[in-house]
């Protein structure tokens, strides 16, 4: 069992490709449930506290990418161990001071139920602050990616968009994406599973029937694909 400051939580932390922990929570947009996001992608992220400088810049950055995420059938859901009133006051203050409206809901996780289920409170850290966590949940409710940032470091939100693009490409085309991949770049062809298919990968016949095919060796080949 996982512990937080020596206390047993009884919660099993999420794992990649397993069902995301279910939840029902109060937010700045009313009560939300994990099931509300079924059929689309969800980026669930936590921040340490309202009215703090790094978190404020992150919320502005998340607001900036929100239209891009929606075009990818992806929703945003924030979380911290603060009250709804604190969340509302903070997002209103952000808009008043910067002109940036926060369009997505923010969970008020005062009982730490969601934070505990998702492992957002680090052992040895304050139990009233969540770490900078990001969970990507797919349309059938599986955890597909998890990212943890230190308290001092704001997140790169464009990387989150890139991650969504890569996951959606992999699901749609049954391919992998190389380092620093962006939409429009070539993708990686899955490694051959047998000696025979590895040998076939080295033939000109295979190359001729694969659009945009490039080969470094039998295990490292790329091809062009249409956008998802």
What are these regions (language model features)?
Residues 1-228:
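Chalcogenol-based redox active-site neighborhoods
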